[in-house]
Design a protein with these regions (language model features):
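Alpha-helix capping/hinge segments and adjacent helical runs
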Residues: 249, 366, 370-448, 532-560
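C-terminal amphipathic alpha-helical interaction region
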Residues: 440, 456-563
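A short core secondary-structure module
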Residues: 182-183, 187-235
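Internal maturation/activation junctions in enzymes
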Residues: 62, 126-127, 138-175, 189, ...
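Glycine-rich cofactor-pocket loops
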Residues: 24-27, 56-73, 276-287, 301-337, ...
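A structural-propensity feature for long, helix-poor, extended segments
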Residues: 128-130, 139-142, 146, 425, ...
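Amphipathic, small/basic residue-rich leader segments at the start of a protein or domain
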Residues: 1-121, 145, 547, 553-563
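A glycine-rich, basic-preceded beta-loop-alpha segment at the flavin cofactor/substrate interface
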Residues: 192-194, 229-241, 246, 253-284, ...
Length: 563
């Protein structure tokens, strides 16, 4: 299937980015011609090299053989094509070995690669984000060795946090780090480690949170780099205990890894592990957004092609008509298209704001970062749920055919279900939005969003619709702010509040598409999706507002039901 449609949409979104003028000032050497060339080359690689691998990765999957993970034939060649093309280096500064391009451009490319194969693309993000983190905080000797190796793809990285009794509750981690004659050593077991072992690169660096002192909670945690092989090439005491047999993402080996006094290197200050790791985690959460949009785009395009080709119904005296002519199929397709285009716009806007948080004039960065922290849970979780919902919707359009492996929709459905689980579940993102972004930050990011979004309002009907939703979000936030002293009351509506924020940000993106997308075929296509979204906007916003402010009364039946 051609990637031209997706490429056209991405390039149009990039041409109408919010805060584009500020981004141009922050990246004066980055021009539209370069952006177009990069996106088009990414599409070629995705379509020609990565896409054909996905069915093989899914069908064969990674295997554990004699204690080592073996990937499927062709996986190594695909990885080599990605890294030799320099695709891990796009957003890093030249002095760090990168190309100095904006993060938003990397986000656009990630969407294309994830559309081709989410399982394949998952390996790239930890290495790139770990390299960026090391470039900022690691000791020179470690930085000078590991950063270029990670960016070249010769070595790869994992992020090791979860344990059997400590997933989202990081403060309960029990893996221990102790000093032995000046050498740090870690002992414990980590689970859910994506690409925890493989045969695609020569060395794997595990970036791990471990308890280095008896200080309570996260204050006792430090960040360590634990290589699977030591500098002399011998194996570290790192053992792959099993790989998980999963619903989807079969080509991405998810490992349980044991560490038995494994040699480790401290990254950053002792006792500041979570704080040191946090920038890497934020970057990985951002990458979840183009991951979800890419998978959703693949499912949507399959459904659209099928609906145009499949013939059923119509006048009994005439030949059957394409099912795309039926009103309910049109509704389904437009509903999926609206969500995909809006999520794409949110992902790119979030990446743009993160770019400005690190590259705008120093005095402006704090404001951009506050806005980024508001947008990030929306982009991450909205796109994660989008991927599964659109895959399910595409299956519905295909009918029984979609339920078979003859079509790739069921693979998208299986692969995407976990997106709203890893890198912070929906509930975790919702609590982050309520407790941190609204209460702790006093709604600073939300307020900045409202100021900037309202600046795009005009006097037309679309602006009136979006403006009313912005007002509704503001009043709902004020209600929840007043419940800060009764968090249990507010927590019952946290997910609804996150969704209301997403609806409002989506309304802003839809309004901008309607204003700026252009009058050619690509612009008309994007505007059709945006107008469908805007038509449902007041209904969706009102429903989420009511759920968000209903309070804990809606949960009163749980004791009786669970008894």
């Amino acid at each position: 299937m051609s990637y031209a449609r997706q490429t056209d949409a991405l390039l149009r979104h990039l041409s109408i980015l919010p805060f584009g003028d500020a981004l141009e000032r922050a990246f004066p050497d980055s021009d539209p011609e370069t952006w177009t060339a990069v996106v088009e080359q990414a599409a070629l690689l995705a379509e020609a090299v990565i896409d054909p691998l996905d069915a093989v990765l899914d069908g064969l999957g990674a295997r554990l053989v004699d204690g080592r993970v073996r990937c499927v034939p062709g996986h190594r060649a695909g990885w080599d094509a990605l890294v030799h093309g320099g695709w891990l280096t796009l957003p890093l500064a030249p002095e760090q070995g990168g190309q100095g391009l904006p993060l938003v451009l990397n986000t656009a490319c990630e969407e294309l690669f994830n559309r081709a194969s989410a399982a394949f693309t998952m390996l790239a993000t930890p290495g790139r984000t770990a390299a960026a983190m090391l470039a900022g905080v690691a000791e020179p000797a470690l930085r000078e060795v590991w950063v270029p190796k990670l960016l070249s793809g010769e070595w790869t990285a994992t992020i090791c946090i979860s344990e059997a009794d400590a997933g989202s509750d990081v403060a309960r981690l029990r893996t221990r780090a102790t000093q032995d004659g000046g050498q740090w050593r870690v002992t414990g077991e980590k689970i859910w480690i994506s690409y925890g072992d493989h045969d695609l690169a020569g060395r794997i660096g595990h970036f791990m949170l471990a308890r280095s002192s008896d200080a309570a909670g996260v204050r006792g945690l430090s960040l360590f780099l634990v290589p699977d092989r030591l500098d002399d090439g011998t194996r570290n005491t790192v053992e792959v205990r099993r790989i998980e047999h999963k619903l989807g993402l079969h080509g991405s080996p998810t490992c349980v890894i044991g560490f038995d006094g494994a040699a480790a290197m401290l990254i950053g200050a002792e006792g500041r592990g979570l704080q040191t790791l946090f920038p890497m985690m934020l970057q990985m959460r951002l990458s979840c957004a183009p991951q979800g949009v890419g998978v959703a785009e693949a499912a949507l395009e399959t459904a659209l092609d099928y609906a145009q080709a499949r013939r059923q119904g119509g006048d009994a005296a005439a030949p059957p008509v394409p099912i795309v002519t039926h009103a309910d199929v049109q509704r389904q397709l437009l509903a999926m298209a609206a969500r995909v285009e809006i999520a794409r716009g949110i992902a790119l806007a979030t990446a743009t704001v993160m770019d400005l948080g690190s590259h705008a004039p120093e005095a402006e960065r704090a404001g951009w970062l506050m806005l980024a922290h508001f947008l990030l849970p929306i982009a991450k979780d909205g796109s994660a749920r989008l991927a599964f919902d659109v895959s399910s919707g595409a299956l519905q359009v295909l009918g029984g055919a979609g339920y078979t492996r003859e079509w790739p929709v069921e693979r998208r459905l299986r692969d995407s279900r976990v997106f709203a689980v890893f890198e912070g579940t929906t509930g975790i993102q919702a609590i982050d939005m309520l407790h941190r972004r609204l209460w702790r930050d006093r709604g600073g990011g939300l307020s900045r969003f409202l100021i900037l979004a309202r600046a795009d309002l005009g006097t037309d009907a679309r602006s009136a619709t979006a403006g009313a939703v912005f007002d509704l979000l503001e009043t709902t936030a004020a209600t929840l702010m007043a419940w800060e002293t009764d968090p249990q009351e507010a927590d019952a509506g946290a997910t609804a509040f996150l969704d209301l924020c997403g609806v409002a940000v989506g309304g802003w993106i839809a309004l901008r598409i309607s204003l700026f997308a252009g009058e050619d075929a690509v612009g008309r296509r994007l505007r059709a999706a945006a107008d469908f979204y805007l038509a449902d906007l007041p209904i969706a916003a009102e429903a989420e507002m009511r759920r968000a402010t209903q309070g804990s009364v809606r949960l009163k039946g749980i004791d009786a039901y669970a008894a």
